[in-house]
Amino acid sequence: MERNSGPEAGPEAELEEGEPEVKKRKLMCVEFASVASCDAAVAQCYLAENDWEMERALNSYFEPAVEESASESRPESLSEPGSCVDLTKEETNDSISSKTSTSEDKSVQQEDGSVFSFITWNIDGLDMNNLLERARGVCSYLTLYSPDVIFLQEVIPPYYAYLKKKASSYKIITGREEGYFTAIMLKKSRVKFKSQEIIPFPNTQMMRNLLCVHVSVSGNELCLMTSHLESTRGHAKERMNQFKMVLEKMQEAPGSATVIFAGDTNLRDQEVTKCGGLPNNILDVWEFLGKPKHCQYTWDTQMNSNLGIAANCKLRFDRIFFRAAAEGGHIIPQSLDLLGLEKLDCGRFPSDHWGLLCTLDVIL
């Protein structure tokens, strides 16, 4: 998303620490956390989403993980208060149920190791409006497609706490702990975690960095990377410098590893050209797959009304870069699709960005 800077504190950062309202809300967070047996970040998320009405927020917390209004066709199933819900087993709403059979087919393929899938998505955690419903919307897609890896950008602490509760089947690695940050989620049953590394961007003005995670999948060594490169047209120079650092780190990864970068690059095509394009051994997955029109634009203010921008902007901010292992092409990109194209009950989309679902064949 095009932002000039990120908050150094939570959604109430505009209030001074000494104001009575701030103290009152802090006490409410403590009370909520005590009743719900959750941490303060989760308490703040639920209270803020429910206009700081304690009873309403608690009711929201203890309701089914998927809203009843969006799942009338299935039997009601309440989870125990404070219990951890496995994201991969959580039922989803009717608005995307038509895709379930496809998801089931993919799950079977994933079990035999022949397919590797991931999602990359800027989830716009900095937009506090309808945050909880939008988080549920994102999670419904994660549940439906059950990807092996998830790359996220613009995560905030309450959203991270929500994901930890809902996605117990994933290991979550974050790029930082405060403000807003990136995250990589690894399906524990499929992806073996080895190590992680955070590479700072020395001249960023927006708390940006490069998150790298080394893993293995079906005997294949992978280096996974994500970032949220500097935003807005006015910061193009810094963004291009960060992009060059990403390419350098992809080149430096061990030759035995397949390298995948997926994230919100904020790049314009002419900026890639100014940087000299991509190295010969690194490809842009969208271009490699023939530049499919249906998933070209991931930030589209004509189709996506979340920001309320009058101008029609269509940009391919979210990109996937791929470097095959030197020993041979054991993992090959196969398809790319957009996610999050349907409005939620609140009348908004899960994010101002569309998500990207990428599937790759694994040659066993």
Swiss-Prot record:
<feature type="region of interest" description="Interaction with 5' end of substrate DNA">
    <location>
        <begin position="266"/>
        <end position="268"/>
    </location>
</feature>
<feature type="active site" description="Proton donor/acceptor">
    <location>
        <position position="264"/>
    </location>
</feature>
<feature type="modified residue" description="Phosphoserine">
    <location>
        <position position="95"/>
    </location>
</feature>
<dbReference type="Pfam" id="PF14555">
    <property type="entry name" value="UBA_4"/>
</dbReference>
<dbReference type="GO" id="GO:0003697">
    <property type="term" value="F:single-stranded DNA binding"/>
</dbReference>
<keyword id="KW-0460">Magnesium</keyword>
<keyword id="KW-0832">Ubl conjugation</keyword>
<dbReference type="GO" id="GO:0016605">
    <property type="term" value="C:PML body"/>
</dbReference>
<keyword id="KW-0597">Phosphoprotein</keyword>
<dbReference type="InterPro" id="IPR036691">
    <property type="entry name" value="Endo/exonu/phosph_ase_sf"/>
</dbReference>
<feature type="modified residue" description="Phosphothreonine; by ACVR1B">
    <location>
        <position position="88"/>
    </location>
</feature>
<comment type="subunit">
    <text>Interacts with TRAF2, TRAF3, TRAF5, TRAF6, TNFRSF8/CD30, TNFRSF5/CD40, TNFRSF1B/TNF-R75, ETS1, ETS2, FLI1, SMAD3 and ACVR1B/ALK4.</text>
</comment>
<keyword id="KW-0479">Metal-binding</keyword>
<feature type="binding site">
    <location>
        <position position="154"/>
    </location>
    <ligand>
        <name>Mg(2+)</name>
    </ligand>
</feature>
<dbReference type="GO" id="GO:0016235">
    <property type="term" value="C:aggresome"/>
</dbReference>
<dbReference type="GO" id="GO:0000287">
    <property type="term" value="F:magnesium ion binding"/>
</dbReference>
<dbReference type="InterPro" id="IPR051547">
    <property type="entry name" value="TDP2-like"/>
</dbReference>
<protein>
    <recommendedName>
        <fullName>Tyrosyl-DNA phosphodiesterase 2</fullName>
        <ecNumber>3.1.4.-</ecNumber>
    </recommendedName>
</protein>
<feature type="site" description="Interaction with 5' end of substrate DNA">
    <location>
        <position position="299"/>
    </location>
</feature>
<feature type="region of interest" description="Interaction with 5' end of substrate DNA">
    <location>
        <begin position="228"/>
        <end position="233"/>
    </location>
</feature>
<dbReference type="GO" id="GO:0070260">
    <property type="term" value="F:5'-tyrosyl-DNA phosphodiesterase activity"/>
</dbReference>
<dbReference type="GO" id="GO:0030145">
    <property type="term" value="F:manganese ion binding"/>
</dbReference>
<keyword id="KW-0234">DNA repair</keyword>
<feature type="region of interest" description="Interaction with 5' end of substrate DNA">
    <location>
        <begin position="122"/>
        <end position="126"/>
    </location>
</feature>
<feature type="site" description="Interaction with 5' end of substrate DNA">
    <location>
        <position position="353"/>
    </location>
</feature>
<keyword id="KW-0540">Nuclease</keyword>
<dbReference type="GO" id="GO:0036317">
    <property type="term" value="F:tyrosyl-RNA phosphodiesterase activity"/>
</dbReference>
<comment type="similarity">
    <text>Belongs to the CCR4/nocturin family.</text>
</comment>
<feature type="cross-link" description="Glycyl lysine isopeptide (Lys-Gly) (interchain with G-Cter in SUMO2)">
    <location>
        <position position="23"/>
    </location>
</feature>
<keyword id="KW-0963">Cytoplasm</keyword>
<dbReference type="GO" id="GO:0005737">
    <property type="term" value="C:cytoplasm"/>
</dbReference>
<feature type="compositionally biased region" description="Low complexity">
    <location>
        <begin position="1"/>
        <end position="10"/>
    </location>
</feature>
<comment type="function">
    <text>DNA repair enzyme that can remove a variety of covalent adducts from DNA through hydrolysis of a 5'-phosphodiester bond, giving rise to DNA with a free 5' phosphate. Catalyzes the hydrolysis of dead-end complexes between DNA and the topoisomerase 2 (TOP2) active site tyrosine residue. The 5'-tyrosyl DNA phosphodiesterase activity can enable the repair of TOP2-induced DNA double-strand breaks/DSBs without the need for nuclease activity, creating a 'clean' DSB with 5'-phosphate termini that are ready for ligation.</text>
</comment>
<dbReference type="GO" id="GO:0005730">
    <property type="term" value="C:nucleolus"/>
</dbReference>
<dbReference type="GO" id="GO:0006302">
    <property type="term" value="P:double-strand break repair"/>
</dbReference>
<dbReference type="GO" id="GO:0048666">
    <property type="term" value="P:neuron development"/>
</dbReference>
<dbReference type="InterPro" id="IPR005135">
    <property type="entry name" value="Endo/exonuclease/phosphatase"/>
</dbReference>
<keyword id="KW-1017">Isopeptide bond</keyword>
<dbReference type="Pfam" id="PF03372">
    <property type="entry name" value="Exo_endo_phos"/>
</dbReference>
<feature type="region of interest" description="Disordered">
    <location>
        <begin position="68"/>
        <end position="108"/>
    </location>
</feature>
<feature type="modified residue" description="N-acetylmethionine">
    <location>
        <position position="1"/>
    </location>
</feature>
<feature type="region of interest" description="Disordered">
    <location>
        <begin position="1"/>
        <end position="21"/>
    </location>
</feature>
